[in-house]
A protein has these predicted regions:
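Glycine-rich phosphate-binding loop at the start of an alpha helix
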Residues: 56, 60, 77
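Short acidic/histidine-centered micro-motifs embedded in hydrophobic/aromatic stretches
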Residues: 96-100, 115
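Short, structured motif recognition centered on aromatic/hydrophobic residues
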Residues: 59-67, 96-97
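Acidic, glycine/proline-rich low-complexity segments that act as flexible tails and inter-domain linkers
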Residues: 1-56, 85, 109-127
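Active-site-proximal catalytic alpha-helix in oxidoreductases
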Residues: 64-72, 104-106
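Mid-chain, well-packed structural core segment of small domains
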Residues: 69-94
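Substrate/cofactor-recognition hotspot
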Residues: 99, 104-110
């Protein structure tokens, strides 16, 4: 295994997801197939999410937008944490979610805003 890629994967995962309570999908994947989980993590986190063409903040806001339209609550939850962890503001995350009304409709926006509120509560940032 490429040690540099392994370290980059760990560093990126920690930067993005260190505030998640209850673990990440990776923990569940390992219970199913440890080797496949490692390969998936190294590809997604070590290679794709570590690219520097766009900033981590831009990448996470894209993820929040896409996952909102797809109505993937658990993933929105993880990536809202990640977006905030890499410098996105509450206003930026909210704006990205609201913008998705054009593409996914109001129900997915309402659901993602509910998830966003939960994340802020978990972080002690809901007021």
């Amino acid at each position: 295994m490429d040690e540099a890629l392994k370290e980059k994967t760990k560093k990126t995962a920690k930067m993005l997801f260190h505030t998640l309570k209850g673990g990440t999908g990776f923990e569940d994947w390992k219970k199913i197939d440890k080797e496949l989980a490692r390969e998936l993590s190294m590809f997604f986190t070590g290679k794709l999410y570590s690219r520097e063409v766009i900033s981590q903040k831009q990448r996470e806001l894209c993820a929040v937008a896409s996952l909102t339209v797809l109505n993937r609550e658990r993933e929105v939850h993880a990536h809202v944490h990640a977006a905030l962890n890499v410098g996105a503001t509450r206003q930026e995350v909210a704006e990205v979610i609201f913008q998705q009304v054009t593409y996914g409709g109001m129900p997915v926006v309402v659901e993602s805003l509910r998830v966003f509120k939960e994340v802020l509560e978990e972080r002690g940032e809901w007021q």
